[in-house]
């Protein structure tokens, strides 16, 4: 598998020497060293676990330059040069590879080439030797980290603890901070909100992890993760909303309105500051933050209103949530007051922070990054938003229907608010908050309107995209192309806005579902983020803006292949329109004339079968007779060459329904029995990545070829028939009358291999996402007025 590397910054020899000397790897007087002595010195420096010269000398015998000579014996010969094979046999051993198991002595560079590991052809003098070691230190080891990070995990950089300054290597910050002395403290930031209606502004508990060196005058940036889950969650799966019910007449919609909570102006900072008096008991919960904390970046967590240690009630997705989370950045920037405890008597400032803040986090944590970025809050320099919601309507609704995130049937805004209302765990807080919490829950249940599923002012207040013009910070979005929890149109739609803005922006799309990507084999994402944060938050010019393409997309056939694109949109491909035939085929010249019908039975058979939603979906897309019966399927011939679908497919369907209401679902599926990638990354080296020195670990993982399957969902979408004219306004419809639907599917970037077919499936009830009616309904599709349009690359 290829260990692709994008974060290595090309560096001239003089700068290589400077950096190597700065980390005590290369002797300052290297010019007077002979080749043999310098080679021995550099190899021994790389053996970071050996702490004395005697121990390092003993270790040399554990390495071999060939199938008949150890490194120790080779050095005894006082060589004046080293062959490429000899050098990289040793290099691969330093990188954690095992001879005879991973590679052969006879061809180390062949192995490196196959795995996208860099190497130099000529190592015949001291200068070339130094450059070879510089590149080796920046080469990804078997555990996915560069060798320098592997050495850090063995204690190499403890020699610099206490020096009270950052150090950089190849444009990235290195772990020279004493992780045994990390300051872990809690403060309380005052907001301008009163969501619990007690007449006082809500306080937000903020947990800070920062280098001890900041107590000695060093100012550092902060990586802030706004996590409503940080204080714990209240499990409520058994109280999910019932989805086994008939569809309602959507004209009952009454456009529920959003109303902001009371404003209570917070105190202004008075210029005084005392140290925090409460120690943090929660641990940092995000490996990327921990990794950067060892490299000098403070890690800050806050759950915002309603979470444990904070005042207020949860109002999922509302402006109040955004405002309370943004208040933390205002404090870090010096613009808002915080106290040492909840008595509000002693102020404390973030005088250790340099005023530059970045944000990290996935899912809800990524969502709040988008929300806060739209406020243009001062101090926020960059966001790295993973699997984020850009409109809560697009999370819980679609085209006039109630739609569940994957594996969350029956969940909604009110239940997510309950899940995150962790301040109810503290008895004193419970007594104060519970009555206001109950009122807010009642409001959320009423206004989210599960009855009709329609867009409203309530949902408009939760659409961050409509405030995108407030974004001032640089931008990185990360999303899984197979994320059916936070569906891909959330990132696609915000990207279409961000890409037109002047600030620097990047997009990563991986093959996962609702997953992080910082520890994948196929890309050095953590190193890229190190480079990025150093540039954005420390102001170091390190070529970060030019280091990798604007859009990086992981291939769905080969996990170690990343497509480098200028954008993600329909413009990447050529428009193609496919039409169904009366015989169930799908062609560009299809000429279907018939009216084909199917009868949807809602969730009745699904409930009887007792299978999971994911099992149903696989059987359904494969064409299992029982589950495919309530649908129409149209298939292409086998593709004769690989074809990539890019952007958002669009479907047009002329349909009538036997009832004056209905829902239509459409799926695009790849058919063909073959090995496909695992749905989630496989763990390859559990706990194999050290985040610092004895400072936590992460696990190397990657998507790998799995057992053969018959089909793979590419994309899908759903629509309420009563929105045939307007996605934001329902109309009454008549039974047995045809209506034209025109809607977009989830965006994708999917390669159909030669030998596979493409299927268009038209159906109604999606057992995992839509409501599951208790009554039968017959749908008739007019094939002459039905088509699927997408863009091929």
From Swiss-Prot:
InterPro entries: AB_hydrolase_fold (IPR029058), CocE/Ser_esterase (IPR005674), Galactose-bd-like_sf (IPR008979), Pept_S15_Xpro (IPR008252), PepX_N_dom (IPR015251), PepX_N_dom_sf (IPR036313), Xaa-Pro-like_dom (IPR000383), Xaa-Pro_dipept_C (IPR013736). Its main location: cytoplasm. One of its GO terms (cellular component) is cytoplasm. Belongs to the peptidase S15 family. The active site is at residues 363, 483, 514. SUPFAM superfamilies: alpha/beta-Hydrolases, Galactose-binding domain-like, X-Prolyl dipeptidyl aminopeptidase PepX, N-terminal domain. Its EC number is 3.4.14.11. It catalyses: Hydrolyzes Xaa-Pro-|- bonds to release unblocked, N-terminal dipeptides from substrates including Ala-Pro-|-p-nitroanilide and (sequentially) Tyr-Pro-|-Phe-Pro-|-Gly-Pro-|-Ile. It is found in: Cytoplasm. It comes from the Bacteria. GO terms for biological process: proteolysis. It comes from Lactobacillus helveticus (Lactobacillus suntoryeus). HAMAP family: Aminopeptidase_S15. Removes N-terminal dipeptides sequentially from polypeptides having unsubstituted N-termini provided that the penultimate residue is proline. Signal peptide: none annotated. Homodimer. It is an enzyme of class 3 (hydrolase). It holds the Pfam family Peptidase_S15. This is Xaa-Pro dipeptidyl-peptidase. Keywords: Aminopeptidase, Cytoplasm, Hydrolase, Protease, Serine protease. GO terms for molecular function: aminopeptidase activity; dipeptidyl-peptidase activity; serine-type peptidase activity.
């Amino acid at each position: 598998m290829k260990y692709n590397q994008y974060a290595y910054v090309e560096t001239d020899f003089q700068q290589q020497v400077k950096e190597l000397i700065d980390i005590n790897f290369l002797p300052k007087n290297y010019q007077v060293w002979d080749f043999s002595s310098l080679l021995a010195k550099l190899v021994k420096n790389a053996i970071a676990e050996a702490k004395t010269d005697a121990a390092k000398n003993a270790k040399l015998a554990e390495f071999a330059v060939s199938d008949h000579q150890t490194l120790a014996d080779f050095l005894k010969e006082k060589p004046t040069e080293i062959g490429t094979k000899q050098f990289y046999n040793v290099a691969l051993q330093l990188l954690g590879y095992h001879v005879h198991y991973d590679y052969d002595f006879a061809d180390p560079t062949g192995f490196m080439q196959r795995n996208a590991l860099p190497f130099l052809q000529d190592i015949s003098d001291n200068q070339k030797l130094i450059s070879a070691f510089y590149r080796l230190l920046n080469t990804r080891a078997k555990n996915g980290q560069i060798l320098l990070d592997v050495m850090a995990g063995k204690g190499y950089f403890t020699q610099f603890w206490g020096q009270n300054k950052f150090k950089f290597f190849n444009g990235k910050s290195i772990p020279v901070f004493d992780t045994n002395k990390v300051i872990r403290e809690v403060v309380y930031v005052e907001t301008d909100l009163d969501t619990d209606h007690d007449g006082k502004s809500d306080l937000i508990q903020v947990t800070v992890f920062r280098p001890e060196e900041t107590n000695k005058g060093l100012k550092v940036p902060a990586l802030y993760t706004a996590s409503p889950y940080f204080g714990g969650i209240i499990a409520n799966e058994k109280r999910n909303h019932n989805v086994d019910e008939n569809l309602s007449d959507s004209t009952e919609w009454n456009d529920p309105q959003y109303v902001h909570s009371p404003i209570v102006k917070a105190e202004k900072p008075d210029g005084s500051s005392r140290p925090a008096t409460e120690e943090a008991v929660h641990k940092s919960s995000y490996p990327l933050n921990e990794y950067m904390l060892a490299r000098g970046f403070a890690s800050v967590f806050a759950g915002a209103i309603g979470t444990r240690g904070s005042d207020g009630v949860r109002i999922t997705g509302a402006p109040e949530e955004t405002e309370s989370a943004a208040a933390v950045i205002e404090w870090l920037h010096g613009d808002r007051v915080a106290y040492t405890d909840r008595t509000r008597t002693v102020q404390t400032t973030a005088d250790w922070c340099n005023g530059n803040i970045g944000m990290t986090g996935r899912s809800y944590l990524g969502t709040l990054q988008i929300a806060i970025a739209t406020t243009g809050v001062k101090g926020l320099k960059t966001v790295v938003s993973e699997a984020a919601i850009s409109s809560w309507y697009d999370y819980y609704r679609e085209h006039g229907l109630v739609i569940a995130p994957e594996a969350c049937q029956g969940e909604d805004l009110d239940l997510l608010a309950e899940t995150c209302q962790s301040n109810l765990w503290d008895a004193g807080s419970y007594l104060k908050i519970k009555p206001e919490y109950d009122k807010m829950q009642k409001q959320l249940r009423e206004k989210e309107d599960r009855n009709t599923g329609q867009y409203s002012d309530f949902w408009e207040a939760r659409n961050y995209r409509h405030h995108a013009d407030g974004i001032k910070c640089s931008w990185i979005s990360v999303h899984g192309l197979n994320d059916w929890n936070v569906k891909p149109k959330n990132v696609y739609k915000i990207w279409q806005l961000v890409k037109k803005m002047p600030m620097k922006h990047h997009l990563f799309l991986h093959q996962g579902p609702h997953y992080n990507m910082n520890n994948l084999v196929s890309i050095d994402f953590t190193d890229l983020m190190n480079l990025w944060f150093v540039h954005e938050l420390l102001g170091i010019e390190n070529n970060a803006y030019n280091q990798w393409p604007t859009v990086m997309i992981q291939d769905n056939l080969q996990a170690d292949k990343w497509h480098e694109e200028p954008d993600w949109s329909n413009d990447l491909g050529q428009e193609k329109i496919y039409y169904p035939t009366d015989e169930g085929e799908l062609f560009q010249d299809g000429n279907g004339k018939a009216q084909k019908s199917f009868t949807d039975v809602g969730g009745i058979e699904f409930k009887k079968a007792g299978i999971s939603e994911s099992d149903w979906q696989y059987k359904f897309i494969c064409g299992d007779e029982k589950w495919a019966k309530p649908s129409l399927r149209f298939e292409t011939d086998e593709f004769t060459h690989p074809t990539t679908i890019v952007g958002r497919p669009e479907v047009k369907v002329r349909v009538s329904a036997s009832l004056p209401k209905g829902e239509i679902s459409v799926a695009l599926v790849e058919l063909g029995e073959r090995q496909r990638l695992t749905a989630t990354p496989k763990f390859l080296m559990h706990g194999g990545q050290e985040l610092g020195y004895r400072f936590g670990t992460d696990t190397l993982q990657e998507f790998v070829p799995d057992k053969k399957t018959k089909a793979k969902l590419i994309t899908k979408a759903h629509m309420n028939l009563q929105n045939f004219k307007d996605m934001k306004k329902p109309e009454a419809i008549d039974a047995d009358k045809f209506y034209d639907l025109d809607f977009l599917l989830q965006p994708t970037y999917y390669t159909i291999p030669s030998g596979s077919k493409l299927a268009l499936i038209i159906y109604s009830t999606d057992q995992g996402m839509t409501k599951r009616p208790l009554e039968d309904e017959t749908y008739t599709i007019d094939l002459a007025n039905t088509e699927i349009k997408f863009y091929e690359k």
